[in-house]
C-alpha cells in the first residue's frame, strides 16, 4: 500500500518563472525555499530530518542574519530524527520562526515550541499534542531492561527541552506529558508552546518585525 504522503509529494505542482536567461521551473517547495520557507510535513523520520536540516544549513549559508520560517504539519515520529532537526535549529545563526498549520503532535509539538521566542505561531484551527516517548522492544530480558533505561533517559531529556521552551516547571511538564494531551491553539498558547495565534499574513509579519 502506498504511503499517502509519498503519493501527495509525487503530485507537487511546478512554478515557471521568467528570467534573463529564459524560463525556469521549480517545484513549489523549492520556490518557497527561495523565500526562506521550509515545510516539515508528515511523519518525522530520518530522510525527512536530513532534508529539513540540509535546508536550514543552506539558508544559513545564504544569509546568516535573515530569519527562516518553518511550517509544521506533522503527527510526530522518530525521536532521534526530531532531535536532529531540533539541534540544527538551535545550532544555526538565523532565527527560526515556527508555524503550525494542521497539527503538531509528539515531536512536531517539540519542534513547534523550539522556534525563536516570540516567533512561534499556530493558525486558529491547529491542533497540538504532547506526550512522553513510547517504544516496543523484544528480546532477552537484559536487552529489554537496557532499552527501558534508555527510553526513561530520553523522556527526561525531552521534558527538559519542553521546560526550556515553554517556561513550565518540570513537575508541570511531567504531569502533562504523562498521557496524550491534546490542545487547541488557545490552549497551546496558554501552555507556552506558541506565542501567538495567526489569522493573517500581516499578523505574522508584524510579530516577526517586532
Swiss-Prot record:
Record field: catalytic activity: Hydrolysis of proteins to small peptides in the presence of ATP and magnesium. alpha-casein is the usual test substrate. In the absence of ATP, only oligopeptides shorter than five residues are hydrolyzed (such as succinyl-Leu-Tyr-|-NHMec, and Leu-Tyr-Leu-|-Tyr-Trp, in which cleavage of the -Tyr-|-Leu- and -Tyr-|-Trp bonds also occurs)
Predominant location: cytoplasm
Localization of this protein: Cytoplasm
Keyword Protease tagged: yes
GO cellular component, one term: cytoplasm
MF terms in GO: ATP-dependent peptidase activity; ATPase binding; serine-type endopeptidase activity
Keywords from the UniProt entry: Cytoplasm, Hydrolase, Protease, Serine protease
Residues forming the catalytic site: 106, 131
Residues in the signal sequence: none
Gene Ontology process terms (BP): protein quality control for misfolded or incompletely synthesized proteins
Enzyme Commission numbers on file: 3.4.21.92
Any Pfam family: CLP_protease
Top-level EC class as recorded in UniProt: hydrolase
Hydrolase recorded as keyword: yes
Entry-linked InterPro entries: ClpP, ClpP/crotonase-like_dom_sf, ClpP/TepA, ClpP_His_AS, ClpP_Ser_AS
Subunit structure: Fourteen ClpP subunits assemble into 2 heptameric rings which stack back to back to give a disk-like structure with a central cavity, resembling the structure of eukaryotic proteasomes.
Protein family: Belongs to the peptidase S14 family.
Summary of the function given for this chain in its UniProt record: Cleaves peptides in various proteins in a process that requires ATP hydrolysis. Has a chymotrypsin-like activity. Plays a major role in the degradation of misfolded proteins.
HAMAP family linked to this entry: ClpP
Protein name as it appears in the record: ATP-dependent Clp protease proteolytic subunit 2
Organism from which the protein derives: Agrobacterium fabrum (strain C58 / ATCC 33970)
Chain's gene name: clpP2
